[in-house]
From Swiss-Prot:
It comes from Homo sapiens (Human). Expressed mainly to the brain, kidney and testis, and to a lesser extent the bone marrow, thymus, prostate, liver and uterus. Residues 195-205 are annotated as: Phosphatase sequence motif III. This is Phospholipid phosphatase 4. Residues 250-271 are annotated as: Disordered. GO terms for molecular function: diacylglycerol diphosphate phosphatase activity; identical protein binding; phosphatidate phosphatase activity. Magnesium-independent phospholipid phosphatase. Inhibited by N-ethylmaleimide. The active site is at H146 (proton donors), H202 (nucleophile). The record marks D206 as: Stabilizes the active site histidine for nucleophilic attack. Disulfide bonds: none annotated.
Amino acid sequence: MRELAIEIGVRALLFGVFVFTEFLDPFQRVIQPEEIWLYKNPLVQSDNIPTRLMFAISFLTPLAVICVVKIIRRTDKTEIKEAFLAVSLALALNGVCTNTIKLIVGRPRPDFFYRCFPDGVMNSEMHCTGDPDLVSEGRKSFPSIHSSFAFSGLGFTTFYLAGKLHCFTESGRGKSWRLCAAILPLYCAMMIALSRMCDYKHHWQDSFVGGVIGLIFAYICYRQHYPPLANTACHKPYVSLRVPASLKKEERPTADSAPSLPLEGITEGPV
């Protein structure tokens, strides 16, 4: 229980840091007049995939898949716990890392011009006249948090399904339905990332790098708890594969159980 409490505490701390960084102001990067066209896209009020929906998909999808697998395969509580710990760590680390980069880089969004100058008229000093909160949020383009969270949560779901379905082991290779089922979450993550460019909220580099960050954390945290996908036991967490210390002691040969040497043909020598 103590180890579990520590694990939960680490994740709570990371999510706390993530929420804290959400309210910090980013670096105010100087925008040169010749590059203003990059940030002059229209300001879209209604997103294709709102932030709340993105968080719901990224957080609830892996949890729902884990619960469905438990019902179908009747997995034990230990396996469910390990899966929850792995995906929660991936999401927490991803959030902290993505927001940290956002604040340090301070890249303007594609619609930054109309956040800064709502009337479409730029003054000579280039001092923003728009809502300060909207302007500050407009300097958090790189990388895309929609993309990073989508690829973190749904990317983990892909690795989890690939392990459960043995997509890359001898028994599972060549069965296309297994591979399609495993990569479906990644397809959904890609659609979420691309939607941010359609909303003029991110440049393509923002979505691409965000996806890479999310996928890296998804794989790292998955491998912390599960064997490689090519392993024959990839459907089980490491905890379930470890041999308990009590069993190890029972397997050790004792003096009574040690094999005896044959005595035939052995005679006593002279004293």
